[in-house]
């Protein structure tokens, strides 16, 4: 297709596909929210698994971490989606969701292949931008991206796999405030078209792998659950060790663009704080693909650690330079005094016996 024709088609498709409300209920058709009578504290009344075992998210801290040398880097197949393939972006009433191509999958979760289903985000609000679901040593990040996959070797589709053993695998990306991220703008730039629940738009494909952090071979791995109802404990979690950065402006756009409610709802509710609280993690281990160190123990970002290290090296260099200068100066003064010979005054014998 010629570029001009493709551009025109994309522009046309960027118009909202559905202005009218549509249902975005979870798997079993019931409604739930993050606060209020149908909020997180009451999820287990309608969704028993939410009060059961292996719940997510969790806090990733040193006491529960164990290095596993067998954890290999994941391979991302089909993640580079052609711009000519259009992806459906939807406000599902709980988050902004991007439905993914069926030819996207991950290898490395032996012995099965997991096919991509969708990705979505969790975030806080403009006054408290700490909306990640997983935490590291008690630290919340600004937001969190989840890329959801199902076991395509064992099950025909996501719905069938969702409550089954080894059914799901989710990649979690922790997001912090920093430099602007053009890859995330490929989603954020379309948020105005999915402002209200049920609205959706087609957007051009892009390389989904660009949403992942540097060094994706470093990650936490544990068995947990969906973080939203029905909270099925069927998820193999991979939480990447290193966060990605988005700008303050990008985060603010995410925090202020969307609503939980339909366009015609008389009491609209901003889509904020759509994250579940950290769950108990009794008698489980989190396996890690990297040797435990400063980044894990403190939850500091790689950028902060490098900055501190650089400042330390610079400080040591200055101290050494000053010490060398003082030493040379002292040595120079000693050299200047070498040519001066002091002799005591000795009287002549004649003068002594006069």
From Swiss-Prot:
InterPro entries attached to this UniProt entry: CA_dom (IPR001148), CA_dom_sf (IPR036398), Carbonic_anhydrase_a-class (IPR023561), Carbonic_anhydrase_a-class_CS (IPR018338)
Catalytic activity: hydrogencarbonate + H(+) = CO2 + H2O
Localization per record: Membrane; Cell membrane
Binding site for substrate: 227-228
Name of one Pfam family that matches: Carb_anhydrase
Active-site residues annotated for this sequence: 94 (proton donor/acceptor)
Keywords, in A-Z order: Cell membrane, Disulfide bond, Glycoprotein, Lyase, Membrane, Metal-binding, Signal, Transmembrane, Transmembrane helix, Zinc
EC top class, as a word: lyase
Topology term for the membrane: Single-pass type I membrane protein
Residue positions the entry lists as glycosylated: 28, 42, 80, 88
Domain of life: Eukaryota
Single GO cellular component term: plasma membrane
Gene3D superfamilies (UniProt xref): Alpha carbonic anhydrase (3.10.200.10)
Parts of the chain on the Cytoplasmic side: 323-354
Disulfide-bonded cysteines: 50-231
Ranges per topology, Extracellular: 25-301
GO biological process: carbon dioxide transport; regulation of pH
Modulation of this protein's activity: Inhibited by acetazolamide.
Signal peptide: 1-24
Residues noted as binding Zn(2+) in the record, renumbered to the chain: 120, 122, 146
Any one GO MF annotation of this record: zinc ion binding
Residue stretches making up the Alpha-carbonic anhydrase domain: 30-290
Family, as annotated: Belongs to the alpha-carbonic anhydrase family.
Function: Reversible hydration of carbon dioxide.
Assembly description: Homodimer.
Name by which UniProt lists this protein: Carbonic anhydrase 12
Upper taxonomic lineage: Eukaryota, Metazoa, Chordata, Craniata, Vertebrata
Name of the gene: Ca12
